[in-house]
Amino acid sequence: MVQIRCINNGLTKQFTPGVNLQEVYDAFALNMPYGVVSARVNNKVEGLSFKVYNHKDVEFLDITSDSGMRTYVRSLFFVLTKAIDDLYPDGEVIIEHPISKGYFCNLRIGRPVTSADVDSIKLHMQEIIAADMPIRRINCTTDEAITTFDCAGRTDVTTLLSTTGKLYSFYYKLDGKVDFF
């Protein structure tokens, strides 16, 4: 058994090795009004699918923490890129920089973007979220990740991955859409 101490409430519980953080969160029955988005495990932020094999201190994070908000925003960016891929297969979105409590994005769809386009994207994002599609973290060899992104036409990511020098990498997948954050 592994011992997990929850920083949020100070309680410690025993779990079977290999338990994921979502299961740990459920077992502690925390009342987080904004929902949990990630967790700090021994001071390192991890996703809720992270599996625990040794004793750990865990602090669950929601959007009221800086790290939790960054996780939430990255998830929304992923949903945005999925919506644009679905609606405009040849389109491209470039997420640039924070500005005025939001982010500046450059959307290229081969013509000027209209308010109807924005409404369509917003509606499709809401549909993706309502469908409760899981965002999966895929761990694999870096060569496999490079092949995956090469097939997706993401030379920017293949270049980045080929220069890391790491044997293993990870990427995220949402209903067939792959991305790297």
Question: What annotation goes with each model-predicted range?
Answer:
Residues M1-F77, T81-I99, L123-E127:
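Ubiquitin-like/PB1-type beta-grasp interaction modules and other compact soluble beta-rich domains
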